[in-house]
């Protein structure tokens, strides 16, 4: 099916939002211009809505295989499509871990069979993410590994991390890291700060993250490796990443929507839906993340979509697993709380969710360019809705944002020229 989207708006190559039509033919973007006419195409009048590149998320957890009670590739990618994401990068903390030919081939077969959006799987740095034996990077790359990470646990052995970075650099691949120094975690369930003190909870100190990042940056410099930092959360982390970039070290970084919108002051009670890793930090950390995003220290926004069951989250804040769902709330949360409040522009938000992650990892995505695959998201910037977890397509309903009123909701997502999801009656 070919589609002609009429009367939309998009961000052009100069970074300005302008009026446009967009023609999709044979799965490709055929033309982006005003006043397009075409035969043999279904005309869809988007009536002033935003025509955006499909959103790109480099940090997601789909749980399959091994965690299908939390999420599956099918439910997770449907949720991604509903959130406007057309390309997502799946972390390797599954069971089994994609750490060898057999496991990666199985994962890729599952993705091919079940995914509703483009899914790029990470390969593990170490076997079973145990930190002691390096995986076969060459084989994992051959089988389509997006990059290498032991996400969920930082690689604690510096010699192992250096060896991994050297091998990744030879393959022109990135090493991606969840950064925690295990000896400083303190069995914490929240940030070490006012909230932990008030509620008598063990806290995770900010330096637990920043000291690990500082170590890895120096290792990346020694290995001449592209090093990407997951979900930055502290003022100290922003500082060391900024210093590294100024020194010319190949480091990039991401931040989550929840760390941009919330800090520990916003946690109303010991509610496990506010438990994520890294935890919500202090107000100064929150302000540093915004500053880092604006000055280019932080390159992109990634959801860290981490679904869990209601039963798991009901165990209380100390025992419940870390993580919240992110796909279906990311864009409206960011548009409402950052763009509408004048903290960033709409153009910047689009870049942080599309071209910046794509460019950082060399993906042919993130831009509406003629000849490229038609991965497109239509967004109604005027639509206001209340976040209702019962309507999520994800199996995970675990969100701290239930009841929040937000504007800017995706209404249609096109992947490879085909409609992957659309809101009922949104474009009628």
Swiss-Prot record:
PROSITE patterns per record: DIHYDROOROTASE_1, DIHYDROOROTASE_2
EC annotation from Swiss-Prot or TrEMBL: 3.5.2.3
Cofactor(s) annotated in UniProt? Zn(2+)
Q: Which residues catalyse the reaction?
A: 304
Tell me the residue numbers annotated for binding substrate: 61-63, 93, 277, 304, 308, 322-323
Record keywords: Hydrolase, Metal-binding, Pyrimidine biosynthesis, Zinc
Report the GO terms under cellular component.
Answer: cytoplasm
Q: What does this protein do?
A: Catalyzes the reversible cyclization of carbamoyl aspartate to dihydroorotate.
Q: Which family does it belong to?
A: Belongs to the metallo-dependent hydrolases superfamily. DHOase family. Class I DHOase subfamily.
Q: What is this protein called?
A: Dihydroorotase
Origin species? Bacillus anthracis
Classification from the root reads:
Bacteria, Bacillati, Bacillota, Bacilli, Bacillales
Which gene underlies this protein?
Answer: pyrC
């Amino acid at each position: 099916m070919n589609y002609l989207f009429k009367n939309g708006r998009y961000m052009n190559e100069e970074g300005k939002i302008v009026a446009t039509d967009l023609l999709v033919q044979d799965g490709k973007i055929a033309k982006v211009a005003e006043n397009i006419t075409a035969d043999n195409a279904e005309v869809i009048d988007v009536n002033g809505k935003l025509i955006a590149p499909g959103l790109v998320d480099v940090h997601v957890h789909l749980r399959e295989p091994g965690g299908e009670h939390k999420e599956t590739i099918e439910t997770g990618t449907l949720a991604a499509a509903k959130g406007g994401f057309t390309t997502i990068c799946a972390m390797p903390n599954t069971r089994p871990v994609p750490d060898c030919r057999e496991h990666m081939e199985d994962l890729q077969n599952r993705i091919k069979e079940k995914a509703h959006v483009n899914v790029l799987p990470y390969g593990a740095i170490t076997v079973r993410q145990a930190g002691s034996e390096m995986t076969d990077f060459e084989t994992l790359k051959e089988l389509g590994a997006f990059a290498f990470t032991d996400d969920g646990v930082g690689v604690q052995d510096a010699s192992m991390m250096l060896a991994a970075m050297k091998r990744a650099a030879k393959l022109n691949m990135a090493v991606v890291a969840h950064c925690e120094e295990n000896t400083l975690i303190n069995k914490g369930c929240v940030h070490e700060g006012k909230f932990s003190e008030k509620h008598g909870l063990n806290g995770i100190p900010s330096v637990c993250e920043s000291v690990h990042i500082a170590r890895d940056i120096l290792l990346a410099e020694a290995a001449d490796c592209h090093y990407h930092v997951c979900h930055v959360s502290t003022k100290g982390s922003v500082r060391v990443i900024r210093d590294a970039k100024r020194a010319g070290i190949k480091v990039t970084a991401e931040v989550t929507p929840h760390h941009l919108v919330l800090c520990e002051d916003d946690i109303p009670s010991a509610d496990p839906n506010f438990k994520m890793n890294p935890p919500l930090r202090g107000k100064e950390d929150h302000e540093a993340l915004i500053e880092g995003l604006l000055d280019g220290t932080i390159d992109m926004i990634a959801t860290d979509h981490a679904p869990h069951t209601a039963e798991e989250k009901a165990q209380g804040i100390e025992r419940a697993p870390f993580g919240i769902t992110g796909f279906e709330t990311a864009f409206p949360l960011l548009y409402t709380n950052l763009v509408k409040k004048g903290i960033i522009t709409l153009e910047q938000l689009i870049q942080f969710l599309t071209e910046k992650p794509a460019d950082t990892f060399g993906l042919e995505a993130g831009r509406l360019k003629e000849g490229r695959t038609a991965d497109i998201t239509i967004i109604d910037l005027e639509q206001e809705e209340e976040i209702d977890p019962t309507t999520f397509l994800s199996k995970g309903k675990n969100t701290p944002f239930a009841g929040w009123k937000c504007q800017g909701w995706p209404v249609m997502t096109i992947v490879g020229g085909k409609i992957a999801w659309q809101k009922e009656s949104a474009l009628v």
